[in-house]
Amino acid sequence: MIMNQKPFNEKSSLVGAFGHMVIKQNGKLCGCGRRGCIEAYASGNAIDKILKKTNKKNISTKNMLINYKDTKWSKKIISEATTFIAEGIVNVNTLTGIRNFIIGGSIGLSHNFFREIIKNTKKITKQNILIIKAGLKNDSEVFGCLAKSNDE
């Protein structure tokens, strides 16, 4: 998260971590140990688990987003995952007034997934929120970590 043109980060590893915002009370267990985090519903790993439970064991999230993007079951999975992300975006906007959001990661940068995030955000709020793709693609987190380490 960027606030006042600087990476927002405290010593706690989860401060500023959008994916670890609880979006569903007593929800699915997340890798961080909490329940109901966005990441437990909308990450590549979370979608892989959904695919395995729906007898799509041989299909990865990336494969689904490329080769099965127009199937009914794929659209449902994408819609549900992106709704959780959209809720998180609207919550951050409501709490902080932040209106610009950058989406990264291999899943978030997928055209259909990204488009659904925007669509679902517009369904939830009338606020003028700008959502764009990370310019550094999958390397944005690496460069962010490097920038942060140079500050310390």
Segment roles from a protein language model:
Residues 1-2, 21:
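Short beta-strand scaffold segments in enzyme catalytic cores
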Residues 2-9:
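Catalytic-core segment of enzymes that process non-peptidic bonds
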Residues 14-26:
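A short, polar/charged loop-to-alpha-helix boundary motif
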